[in-house]
Swiss-Prot record:
Residue numbers of N6-acetyllysine PTMs: K16, K177
One MF term in the entry's GO annotations: structural constituent of ribosome
Full protein name: Large ribosomal subunit protein eL13
GO BP of this protein: translation
Keywords: Acetylation, Cytoplasm, Isopeptide bond, Phosphoprotein, Ribonucleoprotein, Ribosomal protein, Ubl conjugation
Subunit structure: Component of the 60S large ribosomal subunit (LSU).
Family according to the record: Belongs to the eukaryotic ribosomal protein eL13 family.
GO CC list: cytosolic large ribosomal subunit
Source organism per UniProt: Oryctolagus cuniculus
Location of this chain's protein in the cell: Cytoplasm
Annotated crosslink Glycyl lysine isopeptide (Lys-Gly) (interchain with G-Cter in SUMO2) location: K123, K145, K174, K177
Functional note: Component of the ribosome, a large ribonucleoprotein complex responsible for the synthesis of proteins in the cell. The small ribosomal subunit (SSU) binds messenger RNAs (mRNAs) and translates the encoded message by selecting cognate aminoacyl-transfer RNA (tRNA) molecules. The large subunit (LSU) contains the ribosomal catalytic site termed the peptidyl transferase center (PTC), which catalyzes the formation of peptide bonds, thereby polymerizing the amino acids delivered by tRNAs into a polypeptide chain.
InterPro entries xref list: Ribosomal_eL13 (IPR001380)
Amino acid sequence: MAPSRNGMILKPHFHKDWQRRVATWFNQPARKIRRRKARQARARRIAPRPAAGPIRPIVRCPTVRYHTKVRAGHGFSLEELRVAGIHKKVARTIGISVDPRRRNKSTESLQANVQRLKEYRSKLVLFPRKPSAPKKGDSSAEELKLATQLTGPVMPIRNVFKKEKARVITEEEKNFKAFASLRMARANAHLFGIRAKRAKEAAEQDVEKKK
């Protein structure tokens, strides 16, 4: 293989009958067919449920590098299910993924996922366990006739980018130091508790001196 990008230039010392140990990839086309057949078999097995599996929550990617993007998470938090009015045990039976480890750190994420759950619930076609005796919440016979299996992801998540029109850069924007501002904000957040503790101790010492 030719060197790729800025990696180390290798000096391969071939010993140990290396021709017998060459990694081959001849099973790739057959593996592709096998995966496709497995997907189709799974879709038939879980029909009429969505072929892609249960609905996933909207989550933000971690770290400063990627946190402007959203993607599908593992499962909805217990708080999101509670606000949406869905029991955690019922959720798994109607195609909603649940992750009890997840915590909501912002109101925006909570509201977005609660809205997503409510929208999913309104569009859901629920088949009765016994066709002869449908229960409350099950879909009507007309809806069941029109129901088809969803092949793609359930309510796909899209990153929406708002384009800005070209304009003249202001003097204030030119003088703004973005990196320094971010570092300062991060330092202030890190030192908030320490500074509060120091201020409290200083205030207590002043009270003692006055006595």
